[in-house]
A protein has these predicted regions:
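Glycine-rich hexapeptide-repeat left-handed beta-helix
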Residues: 1-13, 18, 40, 46-76, ...
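Compact, Lys/Arg-rich rRNA/RNP-binding cores from ribosome-related proteins
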Residues: 23
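Short secondary-structure capping/turn segments at boundaries of alpha-helices and beta-strands
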Residues: 26, 38-40
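N-terminal glycine-rich anion-binding loops that anchor highly charged ligand groups
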Residues: 26-32
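Short Gly/aromatic-enriched secondary-structure transition segments
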Residues: 34-35, 52
Length: 146
């Protein structure tokens, strides 16, 4: 695992969090309890803060970047699928971001949402809690049932 300090900001990793050997985590990144970052991931908090909530997992080859003025927030018990790109966005608790999805600056995914594989959530788009979100550009397909 490669953990880098950037401009005096070093990642804060809970003692119960796990980072794969081939993952890279840099700058103002906070990993909560039982969070995990898998093989080949890059988490860049070099320009803004990033928070990965308790019990959340970032799967293989995903890239997460907090942009200038656009912090990246992942809630509790979130699954970020393989090869996902998250950029300066917010993901609500207990949501799932499908394989290969892209979520851009200022986008907000509510709690208990599902973003379909390969979907593109465009800049600034907001989705309410409990949404099934799919497509390019992404839109609400339906509300999920509890």
């Amino acid at each position: 695992m490669a953990v880098y300090e950037v401009d005096g900001r070093k990642p804060q990793v809970d003692s119960t969090a796990w980072i794969a050997d081939s993952a890279e985590v840099m700058g103002n990144v906070t990993l909560g309890p039982d969070a995990s970052v898998w093989f080949g991931c890059v988490l860049r908090g070099d320009t803004e803060s990033m928070t990965i909530g308790e019990g959340s997992n970032v799967q293989d080859l995903s890239v997460l970047h907090a942009d200038h003025g656009q912090p990246l927030r992942i809630g509790k018990h979130v699954t970020v699928g393989h090869k996902v790109m998250l950029h300066g966005c917010s993901i609500g608790d207990e949501s799932l971001i499908g394989i290969g999805a892209v979520v851009l600056n200022g986008a907000r995914i509510g709690k208990h949402c599902l973003v379909g594989a390969g979907s593109l959530v465009t800049e600034g788009k907001q989705f309410p809690d409990g949404s099934m979100i799919m497509g390019t550009p992404a839109k609400v397909v339906r509300q999920l049932t509890p």
